């Protein structure tokens, strides 16, 4: 199939998480449909990132207007006719560069942090220069139209998705548990997400300390990375609650689908979440989920059917 659209896909960074998965899947899907896609990242990604043709322009700290001219050059060189930018600074620089060349920009908002949806100079400029706006959930759509005052007719919702494979069987679960060296009779809880407070790991640990008095065969595995202070804070809480025997920090994993298949329950009581692609991935593995009734999670979990929704920052629940 001949290329019909030439697209710049632009992202600020490529840490592990839903935004990176969505960025990569979008590129793959567009290419499979015969479109030309130029992927661009404004920071050097980790070695595990594998996106063919990825270009990098490293953004300096603070506002860096030279990026507008660098992006403009790429747009002209590659004859781009539409820009898709993910998150605020990518949207800012790309939309201005595109506007100067008559190229329209679609801006997708992924942020969980509610502060990113407050009126400010950057968001005002994005509104001026971008053409269409995408929210990853209806919850975030309301922030675009009510907080940022973006025109409703230019705002859209596109949920994230994942590939649905075969539902795990007892045999496949036993096999992957053996591979991951997880006892077959262990009640395995799993969390996947960076170690920042916003993901609610501290609440999971507090709840676990209450559960082990009833069932000492429970073990929590936490997959994800974080800053040194974040790691230290959670490790200190594990020691304070005397959970050393019941918690394993896995660090960053590249085989999260295996851990999801192995677990009995996926648990992540996020303080805030724009969408929560990992909950979709857990559902695709037919796993019950314990999550919080915040952000886009409410659009994924069916209470009492596919999981439980609890209030945020309420481990006693």
Please place each PLM-identified region on the residue numbering.
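N-terminal strand-loop element at the rim of the active site
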Residues: 9-66, 228
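A conserved mid-protein helix/loop that constitutes part of the nucleotide-sugar donor-binding site
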Residues: 17-25, 187-210, 232-233, 308, ...
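A conserved nucleotide-sugar
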Residues: 35-38, 183-188, 201, 205-248
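Short His-centered aromatic/hydrophobic patch
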Residues: 85-91, 109
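A conserved, positively charged/aromatic
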Residues: 106-136, 142
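A short helix/loop element that forms part of the nucleotide-sugar donor recognition site in Leloir-type
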Residues: 167-182, 235
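Aromatic "clamp/platform" in nucleotide-sugar-dependent glycosyltransferases that forms part
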Residues: 252, 271
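Short hydrophobic beta-strand element within catalytic cores of glycosyltransferases
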Residues: 288-291, 301
């Amino acid at each position: 199939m001949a290329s019909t659209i030439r697209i710049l896909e632009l992202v600020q960074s490529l840490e592990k998480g839903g935004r990176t998965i969505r960025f990569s899947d979008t590129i793959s899907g567009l290419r499979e449909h015969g479109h030309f896609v130029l992927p661009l990242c404004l920071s050097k990604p980790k070695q595990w990132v594998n996106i063919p043709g990825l270009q990098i322009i490293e953004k300096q700290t603070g506002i860096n207007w030279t990026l507008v001219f660098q992006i403009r050059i790429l747009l002209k060189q590659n004859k781009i006719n539409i820009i898709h930018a993910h998150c605020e600074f990518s949207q800012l620089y790309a939309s201005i560069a595109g506007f100067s060349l008559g190229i329209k920009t679609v801006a997708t908002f992924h942020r969980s942090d509610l502060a990113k949806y407050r009126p400010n100079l950057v968001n005002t400029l994005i509104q001026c220069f971008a053409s269409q706006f995408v929210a990853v959930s209806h919850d975030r759509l309301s922030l675009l139209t009510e907080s940022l005052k973006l025109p409703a007719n230019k705002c859209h919702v596109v949920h994230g998705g994942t590939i649905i494979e075969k539902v795990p069987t007892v045999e496949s679960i036993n096999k992957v548990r053996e591979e991951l060296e997880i006892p077959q009779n262990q009640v395995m809880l799993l969390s996947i997400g960076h170690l920042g407070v916003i993901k609610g790991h501290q609440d999971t640990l507090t709840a676990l300390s209450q559960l082990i008095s009833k069932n000492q065969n429970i073990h929590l595995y936490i997959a994800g990375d974080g800053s040194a202070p974040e790691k230290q804070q959670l490790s200190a809480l594990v020691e304070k609650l005397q959970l050393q025997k019941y918690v394993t920090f896995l660090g960053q994993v590249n085989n999260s689908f295996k851990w999801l298949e192995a677990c009995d329950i996926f648990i992540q009581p996020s303080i805030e979440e724009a969408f929560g692609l990992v909950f979709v991935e857990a559902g695709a593995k037919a796993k019950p989920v314990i999550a919080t009734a915040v952000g886009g999670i409410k659009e994924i979990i069916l209470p009492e059917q596919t999981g439980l929704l609890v209030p945020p920052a309420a481990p006693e629940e």
